[in-house]
Structure formats: structure tokens, C-alpha cells
């Protein structure tokens, strides 16, 4: 997060990083004042908005995506891309990393998110051990022994 909770990756109801001009676009398109736009960006965007209002809870979206809901699947894809983009930015800023650690509810429990995020990071020489990645809520290394970057 930056100055406000909107900065960063896509979240449950928050947009994450956006083009600043989107605020004017939303205001005009939806006939909203600045408070209305901020309400949309803070409470009706993110996974909730991307999923067409289905849910802000990853567990619900994952279940829906597994059942064929394209909006839920797209919301998860945007989340993973958003995370990978931030990881890539920090890797560049730090001139490389030794490890990437997934934390919190989604990071510790969302097997498909870890898999998809790591798939974007293949250029770093990161490889995922699919069996190890199948564990939830455990503090373990989920990268392969030959991975150039450890993932936990």
C-alpha cells in the first residue's frame, strides 16, 4: 500500500493500481461525484468488480471458476497478473531475489494463485514443485530443488 489502501495489487474490493484518469472516466460514465468514485474504487472494485459482483472472497471465486464461471476465472487471472507484476518490479528494484514467500490467506492457501503467479516468473528461473504446492497452510518450500529462486 501507498498513501491509500488503493495502491498495490488487486484486492477483494479495491482496484489496486489504476490509471489516474480513470477517476474522471468513471465519474462521467456513472454520473458520480468524487466520493462516489472513491466508493466504487474502494468497495465495488477488485475481485468483486472483476467477477461481476459475484464475490470478493477468493474461495467463492475459485469454486465458481472451477465450475466454469468465466468472470470468476478472469478475476483470478487479473489478481495473479497483478501480483506477478509487483513481484517483477521489486525483483528489478532489488537486482534479483533469493526467495519469494507467499503469505496471508490467499498466499498460504490458494494453490492455483501460487502456481499462476510463479508461471509468470519463469524468466527468473523459478520452478514450482507441484506436489509441494499442493499443501495449504504449511511453512514449506514449494519450489523445485533446482529452482534459481526459492519459493515458500
Task: State where each predicted segment sits.
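Active-site proximal loops enriched in glycine and acidic residues that flank catalytic Cys/His/Asp
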Residues: 65, 101-106
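Glycine-rich phosphate-binding loop of actin/hexokinase-like ATP-binding domains
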Residues: 1-27
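A mobile "lid/hinge" subdomain adjacent to the ATP/sugar-phosphate binding pocket shared
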Residues: 29-75
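Internal helix-turn-beta structural module
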Residues: 71-97, 107-152
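Short gly/pro-enriched beta-turn/loop segments at secondary-structure junctions
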Residues: 18, 42, 56, 95-97
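Hydrophobic alpha-helical scaffolding
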Residues: 9-16, 51, 73-76, 107
Amino acid at each position: 500500500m501507498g498513501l491509500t489502501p488503493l495502491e498495490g495489487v488487486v484486492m477483494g474490493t479495491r482496484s489496486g493500481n489504476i490509471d489516474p484518469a480513470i477517476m474522471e472516466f468513471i465519474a462521467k460514465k456513472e454520473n458520480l461525484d468524487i466520493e462516489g468514485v472513491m466508493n466504487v474504487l474502494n468497495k465495488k472494485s477488485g475481485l468483486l468488480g472483476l467477477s461481476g459482483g459475484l464475490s470478493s472472497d477468493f474461495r467463492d471465486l475459485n469454486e465458481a471458476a472451477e465450475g466454469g464461471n468465466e468472470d470468476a476465472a478472469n478475476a483470478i487471472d487479473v489478481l495473479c497478473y497483478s501480483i506477478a507484476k509487483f513481484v517483477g518490479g521489486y525483483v528489478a528494484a532489488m537486482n534479483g531475489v533469493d526467495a519469494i514467500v507467499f503469505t496471508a490467506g490467499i498466499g498460504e492457501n490458494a494453490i492455483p494463485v501460487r502456481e499462476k503467479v510463479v508461471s509468470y516468473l519463469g524468466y527468473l528461473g523459478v520452478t514450482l514443485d507441484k506436489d509441494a504446492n499442493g499443501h495449504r497452510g504449511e511453512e514449506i518450500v514449494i519450489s523445485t530443488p533446482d529452482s534459481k529462486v526459492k519459493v515458500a
